[in-house]
Amino acid sequence: MRLAQRLLRSTAIWIDPMSFRPFTSESYAQNDRPEAWRDVLAAVGLQPVGGHGFFDGHATASHRHAAGVALTRMAAGAQSVGPLAQANEDLPIALMPVEDGMVLRSAGGHRIVPVGHLVLLPRGGDWSIVFQRDMRAIVLAVTSEALHGRLSGKPRLGEPRVISPSGFSDVFARLLDATARTLDSLSDAEWNSVAQSLVDLLLTLAHQLAASTSDAGSSATL
């Protein structure tokens, strides 16, 4: 029930289709800041986890939303985040640390993710991202609504995947970073066009990773 209320509240207050939404923790009373920050994370399919939570420190975020697309650039103190449990399975969440690295914790162990590397994260599962000093990240969340009925199939990732910026993934990472830096200056038409490009790139990258995982599994059984 609380999850449903949070999603409804974040949709009604934090997300306004195609408009730029700035967030600063100082706009809220101290007692309301943790819940307000939860709404920011929920907008891109995340929630606080573990012992590192957001309490009453300073946090900012820039957010923009289109049909089935949510992009947020956020800055806050040390904390851990994980997947927000949702009934529907959408495309993997794309997360990229900026200014400082982070630690990915999953069933495969712990892995340091350097600045500029991409992480594709399943919408569920036993994983978390730890920002040990400061949280500086760009997060892209895409739902099936953004596919506009295209029968391309939704790729399935069982585990988080870390991708170094090279070739196609570098193109995606650069567009993600450039878009996050200019969220407040794009017109609605420009934002809608760029958002659809991000959807297409994420879909292609996720399919490539899912296919490589499938091929590796098939080879292992031969």
Q: Residue ranges of each PLM-predicted region?
A:
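His/acidic/aromatic-lined binding-pocket segments of jelly-roll/cupin-type domains
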Residues: 62-63, 84-87, 91-96, 111, ...
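A short glycine-rich, His/Asp/Glu-containing loop-to-beta-strand
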Residues: 37, 56-78
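Alpha-helical bundle regulatory/interaction domains
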Residues: 2-55, 103-222
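Glycine- and acidic-residue-biased ligand/ion/polar-headgroup-sensing regions
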Residues: 66-67, 75-80, 88-104
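Residues in well-ordered beta-strands of folded domains
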Residues: 70-72, 95, 130, 141
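Short histidine-centered beta-strand/loop micro-motifs
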Residues: 81-88, 129-131
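Sequence-level motif detector for i,i+2 pairs with an aromatic at +2
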Residues: 66-71, 89, 135, 201
